[in-house]
Every structure is written in structure tokens, then in C-alpha cells.
């Protein structure tokens, strides 16, 4: 397994590299955005995961994350940053990161999160779910391709990030079931100690903008007051009594 660590603090970068190498990983280092993107572009074999700082010279980690996502929606990205505000985390997730850890950090937790992301990449269908859907799934005017990470509506094609696709897959696999926010965090994010339930809401809003004709009055991803969400692939024309917070 090959890891790219993007970190401008040389001592920290080298310390991380040493510890991951002790675990059997192949590690490359980059100290800024252009270096990281060039390293990714020229990699052979390709990298299996990126560990990314946010405060980098010249090009922020957010920009790097977006650039990576334009090239590869499936490559796992773990942000490791001293930024602790919820706004920073939300911006990182909006840019496409899969996990977010703050500095200072516990090395065993970092190693565990990396293993978790790599395992999920190797076995994307091995989830604690009811029934795994086929490679393609259709509901309403929405067509989902789980292999290409594409979502198609009548007029638009959306390239989903790994987390967006895993969240949508999770909803589809639990069609009709009420899911709590903490349950979603546990099963989709895996190790959510740095994730807030608000992050779940933000990702739901993004999915709604893609799949709902009117995101303010959703028909497929319904809010359940005080609990979480319920996905309905084929909603009743008159709505559902559990939909008590239409636009939340």
C-alpha cells in the first residue's frame, strides 16, 4: 500500500513516514500543492491514500483536495490539520475529503483510520447493511452507477465523491428505514469522533440538491424530527407522515 503525505512541517512529515513504513506502507512526501499534484500524476504504481495538511504554502489543502477530486473521485483522502473549527471541517468535506483529524493527534487512531479507509476502498460492498444494491440503481428520475460514482438525472450528470456515494448507497440499502444521525456516522464514516451530526446534514443537503426536484420539499430523503432520515425510493404521491421537517 502506498501513501502520499502532504505536509510542510518536515519533522512531522518524516515522523509520519517512519511510523507508516514501520507498518509496512510505502510512503512518499510532498511539501506543497504543486509537488503533491505532480507526484500523484506521475505515480506508478498509483497511491492508495493521501494524508493532507490544510495550511500549506502557496496552495491550500482545500484547493489540493478539490484538484484531486477532479482527477479521481475514489482516492481516499484524510485531512490532518491544526484547524479545529467546524467551519474548517465542513469546508474540507465540501472539497471532498473522506476523513478529518485534528492536530495534535494520537498515532494509533491515525493508523486505525488509514486502515479503515483502505479496507473500505478494497471492499466497497462490505458494509453492515441489509441488501447491497446492483451496480446500477434507479429511482424516480435518478440513475445511480455505483462503479463509476456517477449520478444522472433528466438533465445532469454528477460525479460523486466516495463519501457522497457511500451515503447514498447506505440510504438505498436501507430503503424505508428510519436511520439516526449517529447510526449514519458510525456506518458510513466508520470512525466519526471528529465528525459532527451537522456534517451528516450537510451531505444530505448536497444529495438532495442532486436528486430532488425541489430540495426544500424532498420526496426521497426525508427528515425524521429529532432522529435522522428516512430514504424512500418510491414515495407515495401524497407524501409520508414521518416527513415532519421538509427542508431540514
Annotate each predicted stretch with a short phrase.
Residues 35, 226-230:
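Glycine-rich nucleotide-binding loop
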Residues 23, 73, 140, 217, ...:
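Residue-level signal for beta-strand positions within conserved beta-sheet cores that form or flank
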Residues 1-125:
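N-terminal/domain-start alpha-helical segments
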Residues 43-44, 72, 121-125, 175, ...:
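A general structural signal marking secondary-structure boundaries and capping sites
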Residues 150-220, 225-227:
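Positively charged, aromatic-enriched patches within helix-turn-helix-type DNA-binding elements
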Residues 2, 116-178, 182, 233, ...:
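Short, Lys/Arg-enriched segments at the junction into DNA-binding effector domains
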Amino acid at each position: 500500500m502506498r501513501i502520499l503525505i502532504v505536509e510542510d512541517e518536515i519533522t512531522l512529515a518524516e515522523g509520519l513516514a517512519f511510523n507508516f513504513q514501520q507498518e509496512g506502507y510505502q510512503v512518499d512526501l510532498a511539501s506543497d500543492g504543486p509537488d503533491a499534484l505532480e507526484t500523484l500524476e506521475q505515480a506508478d504504481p498509483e497511491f492508495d491514500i493521501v494524508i493532507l495538511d490544510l495550511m500549506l504554502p502557496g496552495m491550500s489543502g482545500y484547493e489540493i483536495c478539490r484538484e484531486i477530486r477532479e482527477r479521481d473521485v475514489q482516492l481516499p483522502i484524510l485531512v490532518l490539520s491544526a484547524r479545529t473549527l467546524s467551519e474548517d471541517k465542513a469546508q474540507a468535506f465540501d472539497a471532498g475529503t473522506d476523513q478529518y483529524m485534528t492536530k495534535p493527534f494520537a498515532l494509533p487512531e491515525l493508523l486505525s483510520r488509514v486502515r479503515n479507509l483502505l479496507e473500505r476502498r478494497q471492499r466497497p460492498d462490505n458494509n453492515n447493511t441489509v441488501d447491497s444494491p446492483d451496480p446500477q440503481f434507479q429511482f424516480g428520475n435518478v440513475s445511480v452507477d455505483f462503479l463509476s460514482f456517477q449520478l444522472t438525472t433528466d438533465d445532469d450528470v454528477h460525479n460523486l465523491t466516495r463519501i457522497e456515494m457511500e451515503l447514498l448507497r447506505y440510504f438505498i440499502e436501507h430503503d424505508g428505514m428510519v436511520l439516526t444521525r449517529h447510526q449514519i456516522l458510525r456506518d458510513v464514516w466508520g470512525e466519526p469522533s471528529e465528525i459532527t451530526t451537522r456534517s451528516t446534514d450537510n451531505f444530505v443537503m448536497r444529495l438532495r440538491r442532486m436528486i430532488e426536484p425541489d430540495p426544500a420539499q424532498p420526496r426521497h430523503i426525508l427528515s425524521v424530527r429529532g432522529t435522522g432520515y428516512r430514504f424512500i425510493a418510491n414515495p407515495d404521491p401524497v407524501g409520508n407522515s414521518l416527513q415532519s421537517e421538509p427542508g431540514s
